[in-house]
Amino acid sequence: MTMAISSALPSPLLLAASLLLLIVQAQGITRHYEFNVQMANATRLCNTKSMVTVNGQCPGPELVAREGDRVVIRVTNNVAHNISLHWHGVRQVRTGWADGPAYITQCPIQTGQSYVYNFTVAGQRGTLWWHAHISWLRATVYGALVILPKLGVPYPFPAPHKEVPVIFGEWWNADTEEVVNQAVQTGGGPNVSDAFTINGLPGPLYNCSAQDTFKLKVKPGKTYMLRLINAALNEELFFAVANHTLTVVEVDAVYVKPFTVDTLVISPGQTTNVLLTAKPYYPGANFYMSAAPYSTARPGTFGNTTVAGILEYENPAMSPSAASFVKGLPLFKPTLPQLNDTDFVTNFTDKLRSLATPEYPAAVPQSVDKRFFFTVGLGTLPCPANMTCQGPNNTQMAASMNNVSFVLPARALLQSHFTGLSSGVYAPDFPVAPLSPFNYTGTPPNNTNVKTGTKLLVLRYNTSVELVMQDTSILGIESHPLHLHGFNFFVIGQGFGNYDAVNDPAKFNLVDPVERNTVGVPAGGWVAIRFLADNPGVWFMHCHLEAHTTWGLRMAWLVLDGSHPNQKLLPPPSDLPKC
């Protein structure tokens, strides 16, 4: 009897192994990646150029981790440009040194040098992405960052048959560094891209690109999760798959209440996970997966073309060795909204709601310690002496928040703060509201000039913040996708016209607002967000339209250390790059 009982019990070794597995599942593992920044040749639109890449790829390598994992990426710079990489949407709690924006949290990695980005993905799961965060190098230096749920934790929706990253980008035949440098030197707008891309490929609607087409092969009746990422530099995009619906289940790595659409909109910096269920039968046709710009800007300042991939079905009647693409099949195209269809965009964004369940609560700050009001928009700077500028009335194009056009410092802000050597680097006096209020969405003022400076807004640790961002009509109303580093925030309200501080707060959603890291400030309108400043460090906030960021539509928050050890910024790593 004793022998029978003992043989039925697990051995001490098996118990120890099981316990270790449980600990690993709870705490995560460490995942190591090597990123070599190098030049590589690529041919698109019958044009070959040498461009900056990671590991010779564009898009770059897909990073995969699980919630709770530590991610260690060694980045070695083998190109003539300085480089820095940002892990877009990763909270970086107390690890701001790994956030990546050049001259904000680090000096860039110089030619021949390396830097190790070391961070833990805590309390996050879903689709994020990574990209270069200096000049316009993210045009070719970007990739997916997929955070899977912890082992044993299911999705809050039926598990898909397959998951597929779909990354939207832009292609310039020219060198993008020359494009931005020319714009800065002339004071005008940059030349628009020559094509949009899906996973680096322009697709059949562009000249010389039929062979450079992304194709997604599906099985009848199966459900696929598309991890959509807008890595385009300057364009918000509509996306649809002909004759198919898309069920939105996540944005910016946060689950949402599922809803089904024919078409969606996604801004630069944003991610959206959608479920696509293939037809239950072989349809005998192929279907375009198309994206085209949503723009409220003046004509000529954006690329108005369409990128397409192809959704094709496996034919059960064909052998697996048969050609994957059957020529001669009907090819259906989706109908996308008009390029300036703001009503469509508003209706789509209004559908976004957090799950707000016990498993995935919406921790919206119910009380507010600090309220801020930022104007967001374009403007001008005087043309330097002995120059002719291409901005309005011989000015330089500029952009600002609260009329401050942000100037990048020569020394990283986070390092300056941490060492206490901030004098001459930045001023902690970013205006909490416009210094000269005006009719923000009415007749533009005659004076379109902005001020310049490197100003930070200082917050005590754990401050609950409410921020209203107001678009302005200076040089024309325009949608601005604003990205906040270091935090997620809740989008509690939005509207058109001038924000009404008396009546609009009554309409705020404090129950299940969508939680994200990048939000569009509506053209000619406003958006209100709330977040808890529980992450010490210096955190960049900027428009994710790269042209606007270059013109100065950016600022930074400085969140001070809390009183407890786990509320303080960790010291910098020993290999932190020097300026």
UniProtKB/Swiss-Prot annotation:
<dbReference type="InterPro" id="IPR034285">
    <property type="entry name" value="CuRO_2_LCC"/>
</dbReference>
<dbReference type="InterPro" id="IPR034289">
    <property type="entry name" value="CuRO_3_LCC"/>
</dbReference>
<feature type="binding site">
    <location>
        <position position="544"/>
    </location>
    <ligand>
        <name>Cu cation 2</name>
    </ligand>
</feature>
<dbReference type="GO" id="GO:0005507">
    <property type="term" value="F:copper ion binding"/>
</dbReference>
<comment type="function">
    <text>Lignin degradation and detoxification of lignin-derived products.</text>
</comment>
<keyword id="KW-0560">Oxidoreductase</keyword>
<keyword id="KW-0732">Signal</keyword>
<feature type="glycosylation site" description="N-linked (GlcNAc...) asparagine">
    <location>
        <position position="118"/>
    </location>
</feature>
<feature type="glycosylation site" description="N-linked (GlcNAc...) asparagine">
    <location>
        <position position="191"/>
    </location>
</feature>
<feature type="binding site">
    <location>
        <position position="483"/>
    </location>
    <ligand>
        <name>Cu cation 1</name>
    </ligand>
</feature>
<feature type="glycosylation site" description="N-linked (GlcNAc...) asparagine">
    <location>
        <position position="82"/>
    </location>
</feature>
<feature type="domain" description="Plastocyanin-like 2">
    <location>
        <begin position="162"/>
        <end position="316"/>
    </location>
</feature>
<feature type="binding site">
    <location>
        <position position="133"/>
    </location>
    <ligand>
        <name>Cu cation 3</name>
    </ligand>
</feature>
<dbReference type="InterPro" id="IPR017761">
    <property type="entry name" value="Laccase"/>
</dbReference>
<feature type="binding site">
    <location>
        <position position="88"/>
    </location>
    <ligand>
        <name>Cu cation 2</name>
    </ligand>
</feature>
<feature type="glycosylation site" description="N-linked (GlcNAc...) asparagine">
    <location>
        <position position="243"/>
    </location>
</feature>
<feature type="glycosylation site" description="N-linked (GlcNAc...) asparagine">
    <location>
        <position position="340"/>
    </location>
</feature>
<feature type="binding site">
    <location>
        <position position="86"/>
    </location>
    <ligand>
        <name>Cu cation 1</name>
    </ligand>
</feature>
<dbReference type="InterPro" id="IPR011706">
    <property type="entry name" value="Cu-oxidase_C"/>
</dbReference>
<dbReference type="InterPro" id="IPR002355">
    <property type="entry name" value="Cu_oxidase_Cu_BS"/>
</dbReference>
<feature type="binding site">
    <location>
        <position position="548"/>
    </location>
    <ligand>
        <name>Cu cation 4</name>
    </ligand>
</feature>
<protein>
    <recommendedName>
        <fullName>Laccase-4</fullName>
        <ecNumber>1.10.3.2</ecNumber>
    </recommendedName>
</protein>
<feature type="glycosylation site" description="N-linked (GlcNAc...) asparagine">
    <location>
        <position position="304"/>
    </location>
</feature>
<feature type="glycosylation site" description="N-linked (GlcNAc...) asparagine">
    <location>
        <position position="41"/>
    </location>
</feature>
<dbReference type="GO" id="GO:0046274">
    <property type="term" value="P:lignin catabolic process"/>
</dbReference>
<dbReference type="GO" id="GO:0048046">
    <property type="term" value="C:apoplast"/>
</dbReference>
<dbReference type="InterPro" id="IPR011707">
    <property type="entry name" value="Cu-oxidase-like_N"/>
</dbReference>
<dbReference type="InterPro" id="IPR033138">
    <property type="entry name" value="Cu_oxidase_CS"/>
</dbReference>
<keyword id="KW-0052">Apoplast</keyword>
<feature type="binding site">
    <location>
        <position position="131"/>
    </location>
    <ligand>
        <name>Cu cation 2</name>
    </ligand>
</feature>
<dbReference type="InterPro" id="IPR045087">
    <property type="entry name" value="Cu-oxidase_fam"/>
</dbReference>
<dbReference type="InterPro" id="IPR008972">
    <property type="entry name" value="Cupredoxin"/>
</dbReference>
<feature type="glycosylation site" description="N-linked (GlcNAc...) asparagine">
    <location>
        <position position="439"/>
    </location>
</feature>
<dbReference type="GO" id="GO:0016491">
    <property type="term" value="F:oxidoreductase activity"/>
</dbReference>
<feature type="glycosylation site" description="N-linked (GlcNAc...) asparagine">
    <location>
        <position position="386"/>
    </location>
</feature>
<feature type="domain" description="Plastocyanin-like 1">
    <location>
        <begin position="36"/>
        <end position="152"/>
    </location>
</feature>
<feature type="domain" description="Plastocyanin-like 3">
    <location>
        <begin position="429"/>
        <end position="563"/>
    </location>
</feature>
<dbReference type="InterPro" id="IPR034288">
    <property type="entry name" value="CuRO_1_LCC"/>
</dbReference>
<feature type="signal peptide">
    <location>
        <begin position="1"/>
        <end position="28"/>
    </location>
</feature>
<feature type="binding site">
    <location>
        <position position="485"/>
    </location>
    <ligand>
        <name>Cu cation 3</name>
    </ligand>
</feature>
<feature type="glycosylation site" description="N-linked (GlcNAc...) asparagine">
    <location>
        <position position="446"/>
    </location>
</feature>
<dbReference type="Pfam" id="PF07731">
    <property type="entry name" value="Cu-oxidase_2"/>
</dbReference>
